[in-house]
Structure formats: C-alpha cells, structure tokens
C-alpha cells in the first residue's frame, strides 16, 4: 500500500451533559472496527472523536451543580476518555470544542461567512428544544412538540445571526443526485430530499441568551449556535483555521462521517452547505446509523433508560460487548438491547463456536502430535470447501467493510468458524487417531483447522482486538502473524500450539438472567426513589410558606457590588473537635479546594464533631482572619447555618458529587 493512501473517519462529537451509555459506545466501536481494518490494509488512518461542550443544556447543568461549565465538562470528559480506553477505542485524536485552537478556527470560519454575505443579522422568532439544541418553526412541530425527541419546546425571540442555508438548496439536491453514496443508508437520503423540498429555511447560528459558547468575534454579545461550533470540529482538528495541526491537506475530505440518525440532517444539509460557502471539498460519505433501543424506546440520558457499558465490560469482557454491538444490531437500522440477547450471543458465537473450536483444535494437536503439526501435501475432497472459504474470506470481509455492512462481515468470519466445527464432525480426528496408518491424514485435518483459526483470527483483530492476539498465542504465533496479506489458506507451514485459558467461558443463562433482573430492579428502585425525592422537593418549594416564628428583622441594605465581594464556596470538614475553653464553640478544619483553614463556629450545642467530619458545607472564605479565645485561635471564615423554628440550628450539607471548592451562587 502506498504511503499516500489515507482514510479519515469520524464519530459525532458527544455531548458531555452526563456519562455516556452503551448507545454512544455502539457508534464508537463501529468506527473503531473500521479504522482498525483500514490500518490492517495499510492505510494511513486518522480516527477522530471528541466532545461537543458548549450550549444551554450544559450551562444549566453546571449552574445546578454549582460549578462553572468548564469545570462541569472537564469531569465528564475524563469519564469519556476512560470509557474509550476501557473499550479499546484506537482513536488518533480527541477534540474538545473548548480547545483554544478549535475556537480560533470557528471564529475565522464565522467571520469569513459573515464578510462574504452568507451570514447576516436578524431576529429569531419560533420555538427551541433545549435537549436537541434545535430551532423549529410552527409547521415543523409535531403536536406542538419537538419533531426529533417529542419533548416540549419553548418560545424563543432574540437577536441572532443566520446562515443562508436556503441559498444552497439546489446545490444540495444536485449533490445527492450526483453522489448517491453521500448519504447512507438510502432511506435516510430520501428523508433529507423531502426535508429540503418542503422549503429550506435559513439556519440560526448564534444566541444572545446563552453565554456558554464561542463568542462571535465581531459581536461578542452573541455566542455561536452549537451546531456551527460542533460541525467545524471535523476540519479544525486537522488544522484548518489554526496552527495547532497541519494535516488538513493530507486527510480532508473525510472518507466517512458516522452519526446517529437524529443528527443526520445537520451533517447532510447544514454542514455541506457551510463547506460549499467556504469553497471547501465535501466529505465522501455520511452514514446515519439507527438507534439502540431498550424497552421499545431509544436509549437516552435524559430519559434514564440507559445501560452502563462499564458495568457490562467488567462483567462480560470488553470484546464480548464489542462483538454483541457489531454483530447483533443491523447496521443502519434500529436494534434492541436485551440481557437475554447479549448472553445468548456470547454463549452461541463466542463460547460455543469460536472458543470451543480453538480449545478442541489445540487439545487434539497436543494429544496426537505433541503440539506440533505441519502442512501436509495433497488434500481430499472433504477439505476443499473449508480451504476455499478460508481463502475467500478476506475478499468478502473487505467488501462488507467497504459497504459498511459490519454485521455481515462478522457473519462471514463466523461462517468459516462454524464450517471448521462441522469439519471436525465430518473428519472425526479421534477415529483417525486409532490407526497409525491415518497419521498423515490426521495431521492434515488438524492443520486445516489451525489455518481456519489463523485466518479468522487475523480478520477478527479489527473487531476483537484483545481476543485475536490470544488466539495467535495459542496457535504458537506472535503479533506479526496478524497480517491481512497472510489471510489465506496454506500460508503458514507449521504450528506449535500452546493451550491457554478459555477465550469466552460459557454463561449459565438462568442464573445470569436472574442476577441481571435483580440488578435492574435495584437500579429502577433507586431511580424511582430519586424521582420521588425530586418531586417532593419541587412540591415543597412550590408550596406557600407556612406561618413561623422566624425573626424577620433585616440588616441594613448593601449594594450589589458589596455583595459580589463575598466569596462563597463548598468546603469539606477534615477534622472537628470540642474546645475545652468553650462549651459553645466547635473547632473545624475544612478544606476549600485550595487549602485547609480553621473555623470556629458556635454550634457545639446542636452538633457532635463526629457528625460533621466528611460533610460538605458552605463557607464564607474571604473574611479577614479573626483572633478568638484571647488570640489562642484564629478563625478564617464562617459556615452556613440557619436558625430553626424551635430555637435550634440547621446546616445545609452538599451531596457527594458536589466538587469541593465549587463556587456558591
């Protein structure tokens, strides 16, 4: 393969409003398999993934958590990277839309489009879905709700900048007609054509009501609408509009954008229209895959019907989960996740077919030939089908991967594995071993099995990157054997096998389903309790205040500027003790995210020291140090506390997931 042969593949950049679920893993594992396969073919691959970190939803989530938006997304992004490491995702670059170089590129793109007249200022009046970050007209709503997610929308009216999407309607239709591979699957293309023909509206590309975003450089009261920001990542990550990288000319245009069907419209209408306006090449293919369903509905963080991939990987192994996602879901259509389907796929394909074939073959090689078998001249008619299937496998898998029919590629590989298992039954090696005259024939049979396993292992490396090397090791081969140029029958002259652990231990279906059902019930109960607690809190907050004997004497009014000088933060109590010198005071040592400080507080009457240690509470942390107890102690702040109706004292504590040092607003 020549050095200039490149392949650029991208996942959507994920929205880090919460931890990712198995549906996100599905997209990323599919891209990873394609990237790995192209590398095996000798391509210079750029595999891009990342996170889309701006927008109203994250701004609101951060405010609820009492942290800045950047602090909020930093925490989630760390879990995203940990997940991809766990799942053996071999990405080459991870982009964050909060990266300085990306913001530089976006501002240059926005300015260029404005200066050439493709972006103009106006006013937006219509409807907005916060969950989908989408604007909608009256005619686009379905029963008054968002046509994408079915949730409530709210009326929006604000000054905004617009991109002239409608200007490019005819060019987009021509693009689809002249490049039938541009949108896949075919059914998705028909949806986009219908959307354009109903009248393509210009696109709102800025907000004044959302501050968490990339500022419009020539009008900083506006921030860029999230889709313009997010879509530009595919070229900013290569160095377009910035000096961070210099790979735009090498890798652009992208060979494949892989996205969920719910964001296909932005990638096949808005994105190519922007590129047309910038006079840049268009991506070669955009594939809109289906949803991973659970209990009849799309998995969604906001709905809560999600499956944690970390839990699945810990219990069943990473490659088992990768295989299930790639094999079980019809690529391009919706697929359903169930515990039963997962376990049955592991048992049937991985444990019974693949695992048993390897263990039986290795065991027979050791039993009958001391572990070493050689290529034997001549074959019999019964060998021909297995030889042919093994030699033709690379071509079939290559065609399937080029066509993005990933499940079919795995079916082809496992067809060889299943044929090899059948070949054992047909040739009956145990019977051949009873007669010394059949020794050469027995060796030929075992060699055929080793060859089928070797070729299957080479190709499985793209999908099961931990399993393929284990297969090679048991066949007595090293990592250099995983080479597609060697993926044909008869290449390896001999084998010296080494018995290893079972690749995929068989699962007791009844016991496992019972366990998973119990765990599901626990999670549902916890979710229901959390929902109920939230509803109670909202109900209590909305209820009219009861009469009380609280003292409503007010202090003198202070200015807003004076109040802004007060620094309020969440602190954790590291130590607490009573003072011998005072029955009223407790001596607290708290950590405010930067340092430990001492605070003396008159709450000893109501709180025991051991009840406060480890708790998170609010403090005023920029008070001037105050000497107390005749200078023996210095108090460096105050804690939040409230008088109760019965003359007692109450302290508001913060939850475990509230970061120490978070600002209190």
Give the positions of each predicted feature.
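N-terminal catalytic cores of NTP/NDP-binding nucleotidyl/phosphoryl-transfer enzymes
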Residues: 2-76, 95-110, 115, 132, ...
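Cys/His-rich short segments
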Residues: 116-169, 173
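Secondary-structure transition/capping motifs at alpha-helix termini
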Residues: 1-3, 37-44, 65, 69, ...
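Structured secondary-structure scaffolds
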Residues: 2-49, 101-105, 149, 155-367, ...
